[in-house]
């Protein structure tokens, strides 16, 4: 059937309980495909660490409703179990296309016709829990709550009061997590600390699996997680033909740069890129014969000193950029491309110095969906092309571009038009995070720029000819689909 794990608000315990369920299934050697509603990067890292499979984001604003359906159907194929973690509170979305809850957990439930297991934070509640559950249960037609999991229960007496309150609703209680069980993950300025920075993460997953085995009603819950057998079976996730490898793309992947959507990586491969990971933290040289660089988001502010001191890699990358190497940076990538990065402690570290601005940490959180229009005629993208993305950062540029890459605004009437992004030579960088699932032309234009650079250096005798490798199926398979 597949269920969505939802909650009444952020912090109710959706992530902890989702991870506990995934950890239990993994310890039972049961294959499961996980999904995450919304644009988040960090929660999917934890999912993937447990399951050994890339978690897939389901976000109709960043992509489209049709893409969300195709993504779920495509990636669920071949796995006996599927599980979706929701976002924020059940009905928390944005006003868009006539809906007030667009991209919410409830929106995804309606799109995919899936039931919901509702996580209820029971701290400082007893009888009132029934009113909350009943309200969420009947607030919106088409949203089907098939059970609740009670979280942060104080003890046996508290649990008895909760059961008495919920009994008239006749809604199954599928699990109970007690407050005494310390299952909290550390967090910081942009959410959870990524699992790659937590040395004891496997012990934590073992603890979650143990608690899940004891506290969840698996005879009732496991059938709800079975992947539906009557789903459509799309042959490909993407609606463009697959291309054989044509260009080498160096992609920054380490503790400083790790915000990448799995579908984006699959799409790059599908569109003819050979992806070559490198570490701006550890590597002293770039991969050989590259045709482009992708610097994703992450936490460069936490590794600014180490990034700054890796002068050999910085010098090589700067030389190639001056030669015209197409370079794309998102958020953390923009920060790395700037003149300098001032961390939260006020320390200043020189960066790549490819953009005429510096970046300073601090200030208010910039957060939310953005509708953007390309306004820079020197971009690889078509001028006036419209894109949808999101911002999530706590840093500011010291100088804004005179001719920005994007003109953009949020989705509320109170939101103002703003500009964002740089287009300097062969560099494009902005704070905007993009999911390319429904914006494939962006990848195709980036590929065209990389192929033009490849041709230029080959003509000058500075670039060996590209050696094609056998075509492999993508749209998921290249990055973990079995």
UniProtKB/Swiss-Prot annotation:
Biological-process GO terms, alphabetical: cobalamin biosynthetic process
Site positions for Increases nucleophilicity of active site Cys: 433
Transmembrane segments: none
CDD domains: CobB_N (cd05388), GATase1_CobB (cd03130)
GO molecular function: ATP binding; cobyrinic acid a,c-diamide synthase activity
Catalytically driven reaction(s): cob(II)yrinate + 2 L-glutamine + 2 ATP + 2 H2O = cob(II)yrinate a,c diamide + 2 L-glutamate + 2 ADP + 2 phosphate + 2 H(+)
Cofactor section: Mg(2+)
EC number(s) from the headed UniProt entry: 6.3.5.11
Broad EC category: ligase
Active site feature: 331
Domain GATase cobBQ-type residue range list: 248-441
UniProt superkingdom: Bacteria
InterPro entries in the cross-refs: CbiA/CobB_synth (IPR004484), Class_I_gatase-like (IPR029062), CobQ/CobB/MinD/ParA_Nub-bd_dom (IPR002586), GATase_3 (IPR011698), P-loop_NTPase (IPR027417)
Gene3D superfamilies: 3.40.50.880, P-loop containing nucleotide triphosphate hydrolases (3.40.50.300)
Name of a matching Pfam family: GATase_3
Record comment regarding domains: Comprises of two domains. The C-terminal domain contains the binding site for glutamine and catalyzes the hydrolysis of this substrate to glutamate and ammonia. The N-terminal domain is anticipated to bind ATP and cobyrinate and catalyzes the ultimate synthesis of the diamide product. The ammonia produced via the glutaminase domain is probably translocated to the adjacent domain via a molecular tunnel, where it reacts with an activated intermediate.
Function statement: Catalyzes the ATP-dependent amidation of the two carboxylate groups at positions a and c of cobyrinate, using either L-glutamine or ammonia as the nitrogen source.
Family, as annotated: Belongs to the CobB/CbiA family.
Note: The a and c carboxylates of cobyrinate are activated for nucleophilic attack via formation of a phosphorylated intermediate by ATP. CbiA catalyzes first the amidation of the c-carboxylate, and then that of the a-carboxylate.
Name of this chain's protein: Cobyrinate a,c-diamide synthase
Organism taxonomic ancestry: Bacteria, Bacillati, Cyanobacteriota, Cyanophyceae, Synechococcales
Gene name per UniProt: cbiA
